[in-house]
Curated annotation (Swiss-Prot):
Keyword set includes Methyltransferase: yes
One GO MF term: rRNA (cytosine-2'-O-)-methyltransferase activity
Similarity field: Belongs to the methyltransferase superfamily. RsmI family.
Stated role: Catalyzes the 2'-O-methylation of the ribose of cytidine 1402 (C1402) in 16S rRNA.
Name of the protein in its database record: Ribosomal RNA small subunit methyltransferase I
UniProt KW keywords: Cytoplasm, Methyltransferase, rRNA processing, S-adenosyl-L-methionine, Transferase
CDD domains: RsmI (cd11648)
Gene coding for it: rsmI
Any one GO cellular component localisation term in the record: cytoplasm
Keyword Chloroplast: no
Cell compartment(s), UniProt: Cytoplasm
Superkingdom field: Bacteria
Main location: cytoplasm
Coiled-coil portions: none
Amino acid sequence: MIYLVGTPLGNLEDITLRAIRVLGEADVVACESKERALKLLSHLQIKKPLIYLREASRASDVKRIIELHKQGKTVAVTTDAGMPGISDPGAYLVRELSAQGIPFTVVPGPSALCMSITVSGLEEPWAFLGFLPLKEGKRRRELEKFLPLNIGLVIYEGPHRVGKLLSLLNELCPQRKVALLRELTKLHEEVQVGYPHELIKDSYKGEFVVVVYPSQEGT
């Protein structure tokens, strides 16, 4: 069997009992980063062989996972943090498994997407954009496609680009409030809510979720 296992965003105490059992019973654990996987497994006192499932090599990595499954091995698939399949190569794995009729099971766990909805108080409808394109023109077009819908938007962003995203939001929708969520579940977790220009600063640290609220005026 192939399991897609949700793992903590940062606080290792967020691991579920079912996830611990599945990781302990698996023959192999697939991961994006062996360093992060080893940190979690060591905390749980679990030793397992590790293989990669990374975006850059997802085709060959998925092929290996499927081969192990056909050999009768149990594979637990993880991501660096949160749920596999959300803005990571787990989505490609699921499509390939479904296309080949290979069964798999999801072991639910922490999700930055779900937590950001709860923390921000965002109401439906909303859209999850994941990580926006790297190129500025494509990022702009993506936002210009969704902003006129006047629904909540949830965006993942790293420390080196979040300032540029806020500047772009300040240009495109300065009247819409934004929740800037940093280092969710971690020691330095921080939630800031304001207009884009109020959240812009020279530098940022940590991983971010940016929530764009609908316009209060409905425009």
